[in-house]
Amino acid sequence: MAMRIWHQSFTVLQDLPAYDDALKAHFKKVARPDTEIVMHGMAEGTYPTNYPGTDICFDVIQRLHGPQFLMAGIAAEEAGFDAYAISSIPDIMLRETRASLNIPVVGYGESAMLFACTLGEKFGILNFIEGMNGQLADNAVRYGLASRFVAARQVGFTFADVLQGYSNPAELIERFKVSARKMIADGADVIIPGEAPLCVLLANNGINRVDDTPVMDSLAAWVKMAESLVDLRRTSGLSPSRRGYFQGMPPRARLKELLAFYGQTRLAPKAKRGT
């Protein structure tokens, strides 16, 4: 049965055409034929440049961006989407958005970590944004995976290098392998490429192992997690816990009232059509 998934990026996608094109090609490859992934980014003008990585390094700034993810989730549900995906490895507002929606909500980072645990005993994350490593370590603890987590480390190149790598990937892939082998030597038997721009570059170039160690396709992981949760909801009626402080669902009317009171609704997104 067909399904529609709202993809939410931390980037302004129209500012990054090479990345946007790479994502579209990869989603077409990994999603089921009857799954439609509709790509959405942050509001135009969110960042002073095409690079969001500086903001993502600071907890308080990341939290200030958070309402865009919550409002996108609300828009997804109200537009009839079957699932909502936060496609950014720090899983911005994942817990809060999951508590606020009835449709399945998946996170890029959580999906990658959970799938990594099915492929090996311990995983390590390689990022081009070094300032995010502390948050990823904290997320691993919050997801109950501290004993399976080796480290999150800087991969040895930058976002600009990744963008250039879309047209000339060979050198960047070799540099990634050097960093991966260091992580493997420290005990990782699964490697998670941190940010989605790096993940899609590696996946579109067929990099799924370094020597005998798997390299996670984190984008495919959240796609398959979303498809599975939609299937389980349809076939078995499974849905999230609504018990307690973190899982209790707030009244939608009050949520919208507060978003408007704090001036957030001017950034509320509109659903796009799939391509």
What are the functions of these language-model segments?
Residues M1-R63, F128-S167, T265-K270, T275:
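N-terminal glycine-rich anion-binding loop in soluble enzyme alpha/beta folds
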